[in-house]
């Protein structure tokens, strides 16, 4: 047993899978052998994810497709792009990473998404949806241009695998629309539409399978081309009628009219779990010449082949560690309620007496805590799908007519709608409420899902109010404040995970806009100046108080303040802290250039910056990889010991560090 295989606990259990280190090892396998390989790959995926947690359901749904793609196409020269990347676990196992698959989403382990730096078989990084067709088209065009310049360079096939949810986003259609006019480079682009909701096409049957195989064959390509040439020789009106009749007939049979109108040659629907159908169809598409971009529509079942996943309502979309035999997921120890649930609770309470409250989310009703609102007030809840741009402008339209929309979106996904936030909301000063979940560092999903930039891109906008509650009680207050604020747009950001365990009041209080609070006052002689001021924005408050305890224990007076608002800043509070302390520290769970920049700007304008040692603490200027949230903040330098060290260095004193 080699060093590589010795790290695979299931090695020896799966004979076909054990023979495959890389896709080249499967290119000579028969269809029956590929079927066996798919069965073993599915079992290996279940076993691996049971030890790590992750996105299981999507991966189980594309096992046969993954095997077929790598068996038919010459990867990594041919490029396979997995949209989002939730479904890429089987792909990772087949591409030289089986020995590390049980490090998935673990510290220093494999990413939960595709990642260029991880493997040459990951030609394009992913984690956000609907990017695959644009990237794939770019690659296909680049290959064609390189081949034109260098006759020895062979064009490659580019396959973009996108789900029926992701293809609902506008970017996917922008890419398809462009593919039709992108020139001959687009001829090597194949889009595989993975439809696991059966939302587009009728059920798969033997006739559909037959037609799909027929339509992907060279004979059908040639026949269709001949028909087109004949039609062009007919008088104009007859030609148009013939073309419409042909498209109508194909649309009646296949449901592909929309994609044909966008310039794609449509094949499908195909049973995505039938290897005997997938392999010959993919071979036909691989060998097709000059047909333009192609869309292959496959029908799959999320969670396929693992009974607990098939029976679950969410098809085990995202799971924690679980028992392979029973499917029972390991529950985290009971703790305080999550920030998401606390936001939901206050919003639900307010909605009982305010029928103007409207909620909007972009395909994340459960993740944003709006599923309860959707059940209680279905007429006031809107899930717009993976369409953040539309969600924001839709909310702006609602706000323009006097209602109170809450747009609940993860911080990392709100980035996709920035122009709409600027142009459609802030510029018009419309009172849209942005509930920004997953702000800051988020743990196992890593840099692609970190909410690191919202403070930067929101605080620079005129008319925008931005709140960052420091704990669960403050989140109640922030939600209540947003409900009552009608003067313009307002946003509040809160982290992934649970609160710190504070007792919650029955309802949130409406805060004064732009006013912070002193949480702990420095102990020193009256009118004396000195010590350290820590102005914390958001959940770093707990670490700030820990740091204050350590500093105070060694004779350093410390004032800790809660900014509450990133914009507008509490100018009076900022000025008082600067005047009364030798060192002024700001700390935030956001990138450089956010809240601290507003504070230092005001200090500079008032001349107070010349009289205080100002030290901003923010996320470093790099992306922070997947890990636990605590480990990520340790890596970022935003824990109590880091605050103590920053204060001591500014004071020019030695301060002993206390253990956590």
UniProtKB/Swiss-Prot annotation:
**PANTHER family xref list:** 1-D-DEOXYXYLULOSE 5-PHOSPHATE SYNTHASE-RELATED, 1-DEOXY-D-XYLULOSE-5-PHOSPHATE SYNTHASE, CHLOROPLASTIC
Swiss-Prot/TrEMBL catalytic activity:
D-glyceraldehyde 3-phosphate + pyruvate + H(+) = 1-deoxy-D-xylulose 5-phosphate + CO2
What is this enzyme's EC?
2.2.1.7
Q: Which CDD domains does UniProt cross-reference here? A: TPP_DXS, TPP_PYR_DXS_TK_like
Name of the protein in its database record: 1-deoxy-D-xylulose-5-phosphate synthase
Name the job this protein performs: Catalyzes the acyloin condensation reaction between C atoms 2 and 3 of pyruvate and glyceraldehyde 3-phosphate to yield 1-deoxy-D-xylulose-5-phosphate (DXP).
Q: Which Gene3D superfamilies match?
A: 3.40.50.920, 3.40.50.970
The pathway this protein participates in, as annotated, is: Metabolic intermediate biosynthesis; 1-deoxy-D-xylulose 5-phosphate biosynthesis; 1-deoxy-D-xylulose 5-phosphate from D-glyceraldehyde 3-phosphate and pyruvate: step 1/1
Q: Which cofactor does it need?
A: Mg(2+); thiamine diphosphate
Q: What is the lineage of its organism?
A: Bacteria, Pseudomonadati, Pseudomonadota, Alphaproteobacteria, Acetobacterales
- Specify the species: Gluconobacter oxydans (strain 621H) (Gluconobacter suboxydans)
Manner of cofactor binding, per the entry note: Binds 1 Mg(2+) ion per subunit. Binds 1 thiamine pyrophosphate per subunit.
Query: Record-annotated residues binding Mg(2+)?
Result: 164, 196
Q: Which GO terms describe its biological process?
A: 1-deoxy-D-xylulose 5-phosphate biosynthetic process; glyceraldehyde-3-phosphate metabolic process; terpenoid biosynthetic process; thiamine biosynthetic process
- Name the keywords, alphabetized: Isoprene biosynthesis, Magnesium, Metal-binding, Thiamine biosynthesis, Thiamine pyrophosphate, Transferase
Q: Family assignment?
A: Belongs to the transketolase family. DXPS subfamily.
Any Pfam family from its record, for instance, is Transketolase_C
**Which SMART domains does UniProt cross-reference here?**
Transket_pyr
Instruction: Provide the binding site for thiamine diphosphate.
Output: 86, 127-129, 165-166, 196, 306, 388
């Amino acid at each position: 047993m080699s060093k590589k295989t010795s790290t695979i606990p299931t090695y020896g259990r799966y004979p076909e899978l054990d023979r495959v280190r890389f896709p080249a090892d499967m290119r000579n396998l028969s269809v029956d052998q590929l079927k066996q390989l798919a069965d073993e790959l599915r079992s290996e995926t279940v076993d691996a994810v049971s030890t790590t947690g992750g996105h299981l359901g999507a991966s189980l749904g594309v096992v046969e497709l993954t095997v077929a793609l790598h068996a038919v196409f010459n990867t990594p020269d041919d490029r396979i792009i997995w949209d989002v990347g939730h479904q890429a676990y089987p792909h990772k196992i087949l591409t030289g990473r089986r020995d590390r698959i049980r490090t998935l989403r673990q510290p220093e382990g494999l990413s939960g998404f595709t990642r260029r730096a991880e493997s040459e078989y990951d030609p394009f990084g992913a984690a956000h949806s609907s990017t695959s067709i644009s990237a794939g088209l770019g690659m296909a065009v680049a290959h064609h241009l390189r081949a034109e310049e260098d006759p020895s360079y062979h064009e490659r096939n580019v396959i973009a695998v996108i789900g029926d949810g992701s293809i609902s986003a506008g970017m996917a259609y922008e890419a398809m629309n462009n593919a039709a006019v992108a020139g001959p480079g687009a001829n090597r682009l194949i889009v595989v539409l993975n439809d696991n909701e059966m939302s587009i096409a009728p059920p798969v049957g033997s006739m559909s399978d037959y037609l799909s195989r027929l339509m992907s064959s060279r004979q059908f390509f040639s026949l269709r081309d001949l028909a087109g040439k004949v039609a062009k020789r007919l008088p104009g009106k007859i030609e148009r009628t013939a073309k419409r009749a042909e498209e109508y007939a194909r649309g009646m049979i296949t449901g592909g009219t929309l994609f044909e109108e966008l310039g794609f040659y449509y094949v499908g629907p195909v049973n995505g779990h039938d290897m005997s159908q997938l392999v010959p169809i993919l071979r036909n598409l691989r060998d097709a010449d000059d047909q333009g971009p192609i869309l292959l529509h496959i029908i799959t079942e999320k969670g396929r082949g693992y009974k607990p996943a098939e029976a679950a309502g969410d098809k085990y979309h995202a799971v924690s560690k679980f028992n392979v035999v029973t499917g029972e997921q390991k529950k985290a120890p009971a703790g305080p309620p999550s920030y998401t649930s606390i936001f939901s609770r206050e919003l639900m309470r307010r909605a009982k007496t305010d029928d103007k409250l409207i909620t909007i989310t972009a395909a994340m009703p459960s993740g944003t805590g709006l599923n309860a609102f959707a059940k209680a007030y279905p007429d006031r809840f809107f899930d717009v799908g993976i369409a953040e741009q539309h969600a924001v402008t839709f909310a702006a339209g609602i706000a323009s007519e006097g209602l109170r929309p809450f747009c609940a979106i993860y911080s990392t996904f709100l980035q996709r709608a920035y122009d709409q936030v600027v142009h459609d909301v802030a510029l018009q000063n419309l009172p849209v409420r942005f509930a920004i979940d997953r702000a800051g560092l988020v743990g196992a999903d890593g840099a692609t899902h970190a909410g690191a930039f919202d403070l930067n891109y929101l605080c620079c906008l005129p008319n925008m109010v931005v709140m960052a509650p420091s704990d669960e009680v403050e989140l109640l207050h922030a939600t209540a404040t947003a409900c009552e604020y009608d003067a313009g747009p307002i946003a509040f950001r809160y982290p992934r995970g649970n609160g710190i365990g504070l007792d919650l009041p029955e309802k949130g209080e409406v805060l004064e806009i732009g006013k912070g609070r002193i949480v702990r006052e420095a102990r020193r002689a009256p009118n004396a100046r000195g010590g350290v001021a820590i102005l914390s924005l958001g959940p770093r408050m707990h670490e700030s108080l820990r740091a204050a305890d350590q500093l105070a224990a060694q004779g350093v007076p410390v004032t800790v303040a809660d900014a509450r608002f990133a914009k507008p800043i509490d100018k009076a509070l900022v000025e008082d802290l600067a005047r009364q302390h030798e060192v002024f520290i700001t700390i935030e769970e956001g990138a450089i250039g956010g809240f601290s920049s507003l504070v230092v700007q005001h200090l500079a304008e008032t001349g107070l910056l010349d009289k205080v040692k100002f030290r901003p603490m923010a996320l470093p200027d790099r992306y922070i990889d997947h890990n636990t949230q605590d480990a990520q903040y340790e890596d970022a330098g935003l824990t109590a010991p880091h605050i103590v060290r920053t204060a001591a260095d500014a004071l020019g004193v030695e301060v002993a560090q206390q253990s956590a």
